Amino acid sequence: MRKILVTSALPYANGPIHLGHLVEYIQTDIWVRAMKSLGHQVTYVCADDAHGTAIMLKAEANGVTPEQQIADVKASHEKDFAGFLVDFDNYYSTHSPENEHYSQLIYNRLYENGHISHKAVEQLYDPEKGLFLADRFVKGECPKCGAKDQYGDNCEVCGTTYNATELKNPYSTLSGATPVLKSSIHYFFNLPNFSEFLQNWTRKEGRLQTSIANKLQEWFDAGLANWDISRDAPYFGFKIPNTPASEPDKYFYVWLDAPVGYMASFKNLCDQQGAQLGLHFDDYWSKENHNNTEVYHFIGKDIVYFHALFWPAMLEGAGFRTPTAINAHGFLTVNGEKMSKSRGTFIKADTYLQNLDPEYLRYYFASKLSASVEDINLDLEDFMQKVNSDLVGKVVNIASRCAGFIHKNHGSKLALTISEPALLQQIIDAGEDIAAAYEAREFSKAMRLIMACADKANEYIDDKKPWALNKVEGQQAEVQAVCTVALNIFRQLVVYLAPVLPLMCEKARIFLNVDSLDFDSRHALLVGHTINAFTPLMQRVDKDKVAAMVDASKEDLNKQPAIANQAATGPSGASKTKAAASEQSTGETALIGIDDFAKVTMTVAKVLACNNVEGADKLLQFTLDVGETDAQGNVKTRNVFSGIAKFYNPEQLVGKTVVCVTNLAPRKMKFGISEGMILSAEKAGQLTVVTLDDHIPAGATLA
């Protein structure tokens, strides 16, 4: 028996769970249930990520304390996870005494071992709010062209990049106050000290997916940099210990204490139920015991950097064991596109649960998930077809076709022998490959193998035709024999599907009158065995309920402009929106419906390269990262041409975060194929590329 600790990434405590989040938690839960079914001791912990400026500001906006804010969100998260049958052994919060203890312990050990440094950093400071301003919280006039209301890192009009301290007439977007320049000591984790260790660690077989390890190599090639791990008050988080009296209000950056939350949640479980469960913290986290236990992190591919570089380096530097493996997954698209509020495909967990069975989604995700970091697509038509065909039409149908004959004619008792032992043995033997697929996180393969077994059962029933035999006098024993074989196969299918469909399989367990659905139980044949009354195990997916879910997920777009204008208002109260003309047009513009607007997919893109096009004075050629990956998880770039060469030098745009229309049909041009369109704003013949905050990830959509 293996001893395994499993975690999922910690959801941030400032908003609800949606289907994109659930890919990870359902994937992890299925793996945990499968490994438990295979006889291993598996512990699954998680927590809310509950610190940071965003939470502090969200609480202030809601008129509550940060503690109340995170408590309310945690309760909502736990309800959503329970609704989708995600069975944590412990769900905690990073705002806990255990997390504070281990965050400070790790920091102190890193400090003592020479891995912490500090230096003065100058930043703009809001004297009214009493906090330092990140670039997204300060605006002013461009130091080059004088354009007003530009963010603290680049000008949307002329494309110049600069430091926030270079803005003319800056103001805080939080208060409207004029910021002052203020120096502050920042603390850094010296990540380059662990470069050799990390290169070896990330290349160990089985530690990371190959595509992830290859991506991390780019960071090693560029050279690791010291990591800023401190924030100044006011900040919602933990204070950094042992700072000088002159620097009393230094806090850990949220990404330092967030992964420590894995340890803290497990420690909380050990303290509360360790004796009962046979769990000891040091067995899983001390270096001395790392060969006797295993630790697995399930995460999204967008946070690999923190988990595969910072986190193992922190643990190594502080004398703790490092994870056995980190399993990254891709993103979720819906109907082949990024999730969209306007299209009703940005679906919250609660909205789904109000309309549909959670096990539908668990099965559909399982049928799509593999060990790769490739994105998965929730096609709602395919979703309905697959669930109805596989689960209702194939699996449940076996029991519903046979149970009546056993109850009505044989006193609910199965035959004393198995008339087709070779067929049943094939299904039992298939369990070896199914178990291996589960362990390797190749869930889609496991589902295919299970459905192949279901097909064999239905082919057997169709061949024997028990409904016809039942009408022939003297053939009732044969009917009992056929149904006994079919229901034994059904039992195997239930064993195999239990990690994915725990509720349905529990109903099936009661119907079959068996004690266990663990993998080993499949070897015990049901002969001379009494079954219970059959009740419906799963209903077909109702198309109207899917439509109702989508409709309920569509936000009232009439409210969006007011919200956008409010968010972009400066100290004068005037709207600062740049994407549209500053004055209302006097000409008439044809109106379009929301369905027309919803057809356009606007995707956040990172400019990886930008070049002049020889022979085309007006064109620039862009290489964009729009968040797409190939089957191996490598970035799949897009080539886009844009007629803005007269307004920009190529080097001005490299590294920018722009908006690309990604669902335009590819256009063949003289100089190559253009695979999208970069958005620009136009006034008086001047084109300005629309740029976004660099913190927004490639692949996010405007909705």
Task: Enumerate the predicted regions with their spans.
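A short small-residue
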Residues: 9, 53-59, 85-86, 373-382, ...
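Structured secondary-structure scaffolds
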Residues: 1-46, 98-102, 145, 168-408, ...
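Intrinsic disorder at enzyme termini
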Residues: 508-596
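Helix-rich, typically C-terminal accessory recognition domains appended to large enzymatic cores
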Residues: 382-418, 428-530, 661
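Phosphate-backbone binding interfaces of nucleic-acid-interacting proteins
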Residues: 569-703
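Beta-strand segments within the central parallel beta-sheet cores of soluble alpha/beta enzyme folds
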Residues: 325-328, 509-511, 621
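N-terminal, positively charged nucleic-acid-binding surface of large information/translation enzymes
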Residues: 1-201
